[in-house]
């Protein structure tokens, strides 16, 4: 089988595609024949040795995929060869066959194609955990989404609207904001050309926002936190800007606000019942037509370098997906 390999840490150009032996399922494991695998910003970080998980070389990047169950290991219940599934892992998805723990599988929702399925679980799962669980977003509140045109950003917009919130999207260009509005955003802020804090004051009549969804970090976190309303919640989702911001803690005192961490990967392991409930809710919203994964581009597995270069340059709207002929 073919796999994208990181043999030395660095930019996407250092990745190679090689033939490897097919994996074998051990106890509690499943082999998935991959149809599609989507890119996420951690894939850019992990190949540079800048992610919190640091796998030994060589390894395949990629954390979510869709496909067919090829083989099940001893003790696996609920899955059989031929089942259509979504799978998630810390790394390893950019390959034609992937070995995963059975607990890392979710049945594909009816009516969902492989490309959309590969773009669904991590982005919508993260955003649902962030907004419903960690942020306690309520109907009628105002949600500010940073990096709103990315995969998790668009998912946050759709989930925020499904929950009855008013959503303000922040992105770096007019065309990105147009995509955000197509996915339900009520208003947009172009932080490349507009003063974010002043625009938030204007859009909220000076009240501020109730919840900030922040997968970006860098220079945007502090002004977003300063723009929260009383008892506001800032959700720390990631650091796509590359810089981990340093926040003056007196802001939390003055505003009675909270800074809340969101780590979906550990949540799925530590709280399996809550994770199952989240998946059930996401499936229901998908069937109701409220969630529509935005796959902007597809590449064959062999062109993973080109796809990751787009992700690293922050030129992606929604999700980019790698496809296989498996």
What are these regions (language model features)?
Residues 2, 16, 21, 33, ...:
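Residues located in well-ordered beta-strands
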Residues 21-38, 50-92:
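Glycine-rich beta-strand-centered segment in the early N-terminal region that forms part
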Residues 33, 45, 78, 84-147, ...:
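NAD(P)H dinucleotide-binding glycine-rich loop of Rossmann-like/cofactor-binding domains
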Residues 84, 142, 166, 233, ...:
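Short glycine-centered segments of the SAM/dcSAM-binding site in methyltransferase folds
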Residues 93-96, 171-179, 244-249:
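Short, glycine/polar-rich helix-capping loops at beta-to-alpha or helix-loop-helix junctions
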Residues 118-194:
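Mid-domain Rossmann-like dinucleotide-binding core that forms the NAD(H)/NADP(H) cofactor-binding site
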Residues 196-206:
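Short amphipathic alpha-helix with an adjacent loop that forms part of the alpha/beta core around
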Residues 219-291, 316, 323-326:
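Glycine-rich phosphate-binding loop and adjacent beta-alpha segment
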